Amino acid sequence: DATDKVVSILKFCKDPKFRKDIFELLGVTYQSKNFKAFIEPLLLHDYLELTVPDKPTSPKQQYRTTKKGLLFLETI
């Protein structure tokens, strides 16, 4: 279910993680459709943030749970 995936991602990204590691956690392929389905909405709602915000496509880019994301985890 979608909520379970969101919770899994936010817990997993308490420490910064690469996109490929997030996809591996979810058991999905490394494709832009999966980025748009799973990571992009969390970025747009400020639950995840970029570790290299000025270079979104950097090969060193990782994703980290924000304070807002951590607060969300506390409510469930």
List PLM regions with ranges.
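C-terminal regulatory or interaction extensions
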Residues: D1-I76
